[in-house]
Every structure is written in structure tokens, then in C-alpha cells.
Amino acid sequence: EALAEMYYQSSEQFYRRQEIDTRKLLFEYYWIDLQEAARKAGRDQDLNAGGYTNSKGQNFSIMGHSDRSKFIIKEVINVFPDTLTWVHDFTYAYNEPMTKNYFWHPAYDDYPVVGVTWQQANAFNVWRTQNMMNAWLMGEGEPFINDFRLPTEAEWEYASRGGLDLSPYPWGGPYIRNRQGCFLGNFKPLHGNYTDDGGFHTVPIDSYSPNDYGLYNMAGNVAEWTSTAFDESVYDFDHDMNPEYSYDALANDPPSLKRKVIRGGSFKDVGLYLQTGTRCFEYQDTAKCYIGFRSVLTYLGRGKAVNAEDL
């Protein structure tokens, strides 16, 4: 039902066939380049003198004020995942059946979405907030909610640990098997061995037990995008309160500025990448068949409790 608007209306259908309206395969949205705005606002401007002085003491005349459109970035993003990632990511491997079936066959309805770039994940959250939740809430006379978004790296790790601060894995303990010898996640146990854990590629999202927060697949199956930009030294300078390091890289920025943190490990990774503290990266404009995402909402606070049961 959520994708009904993607198809031609009945009046435009040919022989009553349900077909995708290709004009709607792109999603357009806008965001503000806060870093550029901050850099501009940080200059020591002397408007009375008709110029400004930078941090080096150099004086410049103001040629005219640029309007806010300079800081508003327009993004046009493909709606559908890259179906060819199953072939591109594994050369000399027979993954054509996954390419042909994974993104449309009902057998994969409960499998994680993959083949989505970091930019597409953000665009989905914008669409979900504006066109689904807030539009519906406004129609019901309810207040808006915070935007759906990708979790920060710190939020993801906190959720992954499930309250077990000293455990290397979301399920607790230092082992990746339970007492019966069964693997506790979908990953690559040994070289050339993808099936001992019960899955060859991805598996349904509820195939393994959740952590103590009730969250599934915080380790294995598919790795997950976070909102955090990747920097090897980020732990040396980020804050201890809701730490986050972000950088909105533009299309012409170098690749090193387009790195985004991924967490959790996937079906193709060894056990190290399933640990809650292991971090890796991928480029924001790159889609992979082993990377997905999950959306989060910032907590709004608790309303006044009526009785003890509401606490």
C-alpha cells in the first residue's frame, strides 16, 4: 500500500496491467549545508565598514549578500535498490538468481533490504517522515514527531550491546555458539564456509534470537549504515555526551570525505566484524548486497503518568 502511488493510475493503465510509473523512480528532497553556513557565520564581519576581516587579519570588501539558497542542497535519489549488487560484489560467483528474485519475490518479504546507498537510506527516512508519519499525524490532528533518521555510531553500539556493557557480542559472552554448538548469528564461520550457521546469503530477520533490548540482527546477516562519518581518530576528539562526528560530503568531495561508518558485520564477514565494538566503513554513494539499514527516532520524553501502570 505504501508504494501504491508508484504505479500508473487505473486511467493510465494499458490493458489494466499494473506498471511502475518511471517518472516516480527518483525522490527529490532538500537539506541545508550547515558546515558552509557555520564557516560563513564565523567570519568577523564589519558591515558598517562594508567589509569583513578573517582570522588572519586580512580585509575584504563585501560584494553582496548571498541568499539562503546557497546553503540549500537539492538531492535527487533513485528510489529502488541496486539489484545488480549481488553480481558486482562477488566476481566469478553464481548469484544471478539472487539478482533476479531478491527484490521482488514474496519469498524474500521478511529478508533485509540491501543494495541501498547511505544517501538512499537518508532519502527514505525523509520520505518516511514527511509523506508517511507527519502527513498522517497532521490529518489526525496529532503533533509531529521527530524525524526518522539513521542511528549515530554511538547509538547503534549502545543498542547492539543490549545493556551488556562488557560483552563483545549482542547476545552476551565471548562465544559465537550456544551450549548446543549452534551459531548465534549469520556470518562466515570459516574460509569458504557460509552455511554452517544456517544461512548461505541473507536470512529472514527473525532467524536468530534478539538481544536483551529485543533487537534482531544487531550482529550478522547484513551490516548497517550509521549517520556517522568515518575517521580513524574520532575517539580522540568526539564528545562524551551523545558523541557524533558528521560530514555532509558533496558530489565533488574526495572519496576520503565520503566514508560512513557501518556496523554489525554481515553474512560474508568473519566473527570479528560481529563484535559490538568493531567499526568499518563504506562510501556514501556505494551500494552493497551485504549492507542494509534501520531507522531510529529521537526520544521525545515521557508524558504525565496517570497511574503506576503507565510508568
Name each model-derived stretch.
Residues 13, 31, 40-43, 50, ...:
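Functional-site microenvironments in short loops/helix caps that host divalent-cation chemistry
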Residues 289-305:
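Short, structured beta-strand segments at or near domain termini in extracellular proteins/domains
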Residues 275, 282, 293-295:
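Extended, hydrophobic interaction surfaces within ordered domains
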Residues 2-43, 47:
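Low-complexity, serine/threonine/proline-enriched polar segments
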Residues 283-287:
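C-terminal beta-signal and terminal closure region of outer-membrane beta-barrel proteins
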